[in-house]
Amino acid sequence: MTTPRVPTTFTRKVAGGVKTTTTGSSLPTNNTSTTTTTTTTAAKKLPNGCKISIKNSNLLTSTGLTDLDDIIGGGIPIGSILMIEEDINSSYYMFLLKYFLAEGVLQQQGVFFSSLIGIDPFEILNKLPARITKEEEIEADKNDTTNNINTNINTNNNNKQPTDELKIAWRYQQYVSNELSKQQQQQSASTIMNQTFCHSYDFTRKMNVQSMNPELIHTLSHDAQSQAEGTSPYRNLFLEIQNLVYKYNKEAAMNPDQTRVLRLCIQSFSSPLWSNDEEGVIEFLHALKGLLRSSVATCVISVPTYIYSGAFVKKIAHLCDTVVSINSFSGLGGETPEQFAEYLGLFNIRKIARLNTLSLSFHPDMLTFVFKMKRRKMCIETIHLPPESSRAGDSKPDNNDSNKNKSDQNNIVSKMKSGSGLLCGGGGGGSSNNNPLDF
């Protein structure tokens, strides 16, 4: 007597570690609800103020300034170092540091600030800008733009004929109205996408100190006694950072769903007021870079590169992942050309982060931008130069004035360093003969 054959049983593994069993005699059914529930897995929760880069899948956190996030690839990669080259003629770099710190406070992230140049860290933390909603920002920008339009129209009334006013001012008004509507649409769309990634700030108001969590605020100030004993400030700084990084890594390992990112901010790093030990600077950056690679922390440092040689600046820039610089027009000598009248200086990209890859996953369209300070915020914009010659039918400009304006533009940009060499893998502080507008 022949025994019936037992149907063959197959075991299949699906996502999430759930096993499903099928038999050779089973037939497909139309009930798909049971299969979909077993194959879906819950998405892993990201830390506050973070997102995944669509270019290289790195975990990013915001600098606090949307314009800066856009030009460096979406934000600062976790585990990287962002270096800001300070300007000898201004302190605009402090606005970037305050943006970075304020964003960390609002995102309930750990914030560490250190300045060994005689500045009390709490003095900086008490002057962080207050948060402003997107609606308030749009309304403020609209009012500022309207005031600028009225000022320009009143100025044109003294210099233009009535026919010119109707032809130019009316078209200008229509152009600005269209630009405002586009800007509002873009900002409303970005609000939905990035409502928890980057906030807007108003520098005319101060952040409420009581809103800060004392357990998440960490500082390190200059200790004159340790300096007298001969202890290196870089060693003390690294030990303090190392303890904080280990603390946040341990908390993230114990409770992954409540991971907090640690933001490290160091003002005027490697300044002579810290120490004259250049080897200590290189050793500190080596150790810091290795420490951050396996952590949930990111670091922003500002460096007064104008006091060091080009070779030493290249070493520092090589150990940092992202390098940007601010160069103000003040102190360059001569008058600022009319085309740059509303701007305060140039903002250059020296280096883009390359984490977990050998090549650049983000290629910026430009390396040189311009920045300006509005009443409430800082803006980084693309350079737009007007055409050299006027349109057909208009009065021809004087050749001498045209040549003078062109030479002024060339002179003012020739005094700024180009970052194209470092971006392609070279060192920092490019040759002064390079034109930063040669993209």
Swiss-Prot record:
Pathway(s) per entry: tRNA modification; 5-methoxycarbonylmethyl-2-thiouridine-tRNA biosynthesis
GO cellular component terms, A-Z: cytoplasm; elongator holoenzyme complex; transcription elongation factor complex
Listed GO biological process terms: regulation of transcription by RNA polymerase II; tRNA wobble uridine modification
Principal place of residence: cytoplasm
Segments for region (Disordered): 386-439
Cellular localization per UniProt: Cytoplasm; Nucleus
InterPro entries in UniProt: Elongator_complex_protein_4, P-loop_NTPase
UniProt entry tagged with the keyword Nucleus: yes
Composition bias type Basic and acidic residues, residue spans: 391-407
Keyword terms, alphabetized: Cytoplasm, Nucleus, tRNA processing
Gene3D superfamilies on file: P-loop containing nucleotide triphosphate hydrolases
CDD domains named among the record's database cross-references: Elp4
Keyword Nucleus: yes
GO molecular function term, any single one: phosphorylase kinase regulator activity
Biased amino acid composition, Gly residues: 422-431
PANTHER family xrefs: ELONGATOR COMPLEX PROTEIN 4, PAX6 NEIGHBOR PROTEIN PAXNEB
Subunit structure: Component of the elongator complex.
Known function: Component of the elongator complex which is required for multiple tRNA modifications, including mcm5U (5-methoxycarbonylmethyl uridine), mcm5s2U (5-methoxycarbonylmethyl-2-thiouridine), and ncm5U (5-carbamoylmethyl uridine). The elongator complex catalyzes the formation of carboxymethyluridine in the wobble base at position 34 in tRNAs.
Family of the protein in this entry: Belongs to the ELP4 family.
Protein name per UniProt: Elongator complex protein 4
Species of the source: Dictyostelium discoideum (Social amoeba)
Taxonomy of the source species: Eukaryota, Amoebozoa, Evosea, Eumycetozoa, Dictyostelia
